[in-house]
Amino acid sequence: MLSVILKESVRNLGKAGVVTKVKPGYARYLLAQKKAVRATKENLKILEEQHISIQQENLEKLEAAKALQVSLKDEFLIIIRQAADDGKLFGSVTPKCISKLLSDKGYNIHYHNIFFHSVIKYIGEYVVNLELHHDLVVPMMLYVVKNDLGAMQAQKLHLDKQKKEEKAKDEVSATEKDEELMLSSVTNDNDGDGAKEIVVEGTEESQ
């Protein structure tokens, strides 16, 4: 195990500035990606001196991740794989496969930053998670199909889903707007009502 200082937040390891131990292979990845430096006495001293600048750099990376999130908003992935009649793949879909698909679309996301909840071994629909930043994980739909026809069907299915979701959002927005107008109307009516004076007549005493 090697000790490294995180220069930015990393899932399952910690936030920027934390000293942690990792396996040599993972340490090489972190060092190559400039996500960490070796935990030497000199680097620990530099860390203390540059703590504020490291935090600022981390915030800038978070803003860049948010911008990437916007670009990924309408994206989805389709991958063609050979499978048996029961839909079981001859192999599996790995984070490296997802990273390659994203790279083909122009997005540079390392496979270490891609994860899903279970191994993908069957044809079907899945949600893969893209860790754009320690504090920002973006879900993306993945369709695993057997052939080009399946890819066309998956594309149509996804676009239909998007249209339904957009329509549902528009309906919710319209309903909320109507409710706001009704509330505003009721409030204005109440404000227009003047206070009414109630006069109670006294009873004359018998002479």
Curated annotation (Swiss-Prot):
Domain of life (superkingdom): Bacteria
Record-annotated disulphide pairs: none
Keyword Metal-binding in record: no
Keyword rRNA-binding: yes
Keywords, ordered alphabetically: Ribonucleoprotein, Ribosomal protein, RNA-binding, rRNA-binding
GO molecular function: rRNA binding; structural constituent of ribosome
Compositionally biased region (Basic and acidic residues): 162-176
GO BP field: translation
Chain residue ranges for the region called Disordered: 162-207
Cellular component terms per the entry's GO annotation: ribonucleoprotein complex; ribosome
PANTHER family tied to this protein: 50S RIBOSOMAL PROTEIN L9 (PTHR21368)
HAMAP family (UniProt xref): Ribosomal_bL9
Family of the protein in this entry: Belongs to the bacterial ribosomal protein bL9 family.
Record's function text: Binds to the 23S rRNA.
This protein's name: Large ribosomal subunit protein bL9
Source species of the chain: Ehrlichia ruminantium (strain Gardel)
Top-level taxonomy: Bacteria, Pseudomonadati, Pseudomonadota, Alphaproteobacteria, Rickettsiales
